[in-house]
């Protein structure tokens, strides 16, 4: 879901019957205190939905043009394993990024924490918003 973070609780509650039993990606950031994600509301209102947290740690520029010098950037996400995971990973790949699962939905705070260094570099260090991260392995 991509609605303003401040509208998430109301949107989830109003549409809970339609959302339940679906695969949902929580993409919105609720700025201004409290958790960035809306996972608690999703879990309370849509107990049969498969909830993921992704697409929340980069600026939109990285989704519109995911082209980088050293190949695709990694998009950190979390959520349940299973068939819905492959759908989420296919979507991330289709956008042009490499899916990097950090675990089940209990890792949402870890996914959310990626936003902090992104903001520090994009704004604080004035590197611009079109930047992303990549996990390097031997």
Kindly give the residue locations of the regions a language model identified:
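Short, structured loop/turn "capping" segments at alpha-beta junctions
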Residues: 9, 48-53, 99-101
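Short beta->alpha connector loops
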Residues: 4-8, 57-59, 81-82
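Rossmann-like NAD(P)-binding element
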Residues: 1-23, 29
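Short glycine-rich or small-residue beta-strand-to-loop segments that form or flank ligand, phosphate
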Residues: 24-26, 74-77
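Rossmann-fold NAD(P)-binding glycine/threonine-rich loop
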Residues: 18-69, 84
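Active-site-lining helix/loop region of Rossmann-like oxidoreductase modules
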Residues: 75-138
């Amino acid at each position: 879901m991509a609605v303003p973070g401040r509208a998430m609780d109301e949107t989830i509650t109003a549409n809970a019957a339609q959302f339940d039993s679906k695969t949902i990606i929580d993409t919105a950031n609720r700025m201004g205190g409290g958790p960035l994600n809306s996972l608690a509301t999703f879990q309370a209102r849509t107990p049969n939905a498969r909830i993921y947290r992704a697409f929340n740690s980069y600026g939109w520029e990285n989704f519109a043009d995911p082209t980088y010098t050293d190949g695709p950037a990694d998009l950190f996400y979390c959520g349940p394993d299973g068939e819905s995971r492959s759908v989420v990973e296919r979507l991330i790949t289709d956008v042009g990024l490499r899916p990097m699962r950090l675990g089940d939905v209990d890792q949402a705070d870890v996914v959310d924490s990626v936003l902090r260094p992104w903001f520090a570099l994009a704004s604080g260090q004035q590197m611009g918003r079109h930047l992303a991260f990549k996990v390097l392995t031997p």
